[in-house]
Amino acid sequence: MSEPEKSDTDRIFVHDFVLPVRIGAFDREHDAPQQVRFNVDARIARPARVPERLPEVFSYDLITDGIRAIVAQGHIHLVETLAERIAASVLAHPQILSVTVRVEKLEVGPGSVGVEITRAK
């Protein structure tokens, strides 16, 4: 029996993170925040050894704190712009190799609408 192939990366993710966001290009969207769902998957270099303490790992709090900081900067016209800013924020961390960001506006129509982007260093 062959040994499974080892990956040189791990994945850290934040899924179904929802915040009120001032977003939208239309005048009617400037009046109040909308609920927006964020899904972020980031690839990090696999550590040389199994981490045993929090300072040895990339914390998902860095992702959620980054999203909160971007949203707090004020009104954003496009989900594409928001996704790009989040991707840049995550990629600014040296451990991150690539990131996929999905941003969904939850209050437009009967479902959700949004964008998903993948960026790498």
What are these model-derived regions, one by one?
Residues 1-121:
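N-terminal, polar/charged subdomain of small-to-medium soluble alpha/beta proteins
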